[in-house]
Amino acid sequence: THKHIDHLTGIIDHLTGIIWMIRVICQNMNSGKYEGEVTIYGHAEVISLLHNLAEQLLPKKQTRFIGDRLHLICVSDAETRTINDRNVTFFDIGSTKAKQFGFSMELSSGKKLVYCGDEPYNDCEKPYAKGCEWLLHEAFCLYSERDLFNPYEKHHSTVKDACELAQKLHVPNLVLYHTEDKNIQNRKELYSAEGESYFSGNLYIPNDLESIEIV
């Protein structure tokens, strides 16, 4: 989605970033453990950076697969691609920090799943997000704990903010992610309790590796 270091390289105790994924995939291609191809989509700044970092950080026995079996594909604002038999439209979220894309995916039912990126929703996303079936939106912390975590200073929102947004956009299913983890054992319960006061649809706060069926 964008070039912030925690997403490109991965940081300790967080989900590993895209550079680490490229390394592992190419490593397994080289050893014969990874069959087939893989395609990574991103805007021009991200794709250029991935090319450069991979060439500088990874050995040639791994980078030789880039452009051959591992494809780094540039996409533009409002561009639609067919991915796994689904029409996916990429869009610029209007970030003031770094160029960043979200996407809208057409589901088999004809309805849409929309991912808003790593920052709070901007009005420029409305043509994609309004009335979608599934909305994926970040929520850094509870609104009741905003003074503790300072989400707005980090260009993030709260559970209350995301839920009010989903209600306003007439979204039936809301998935919250990119949350703090200080009280991870009780996060689902606490976030659900706050969110249900502002959102009447189905609210999901998934744990790591939890699956959600989307149709």
Region spans (language model):
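Binuclear metal-dependent hydrolase catalytic cores
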Residues: 1-114, 120, 125, 189-215
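Cap/insert and terminal regions of metallo-dependent hydrolase folds
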Residues: 120-210
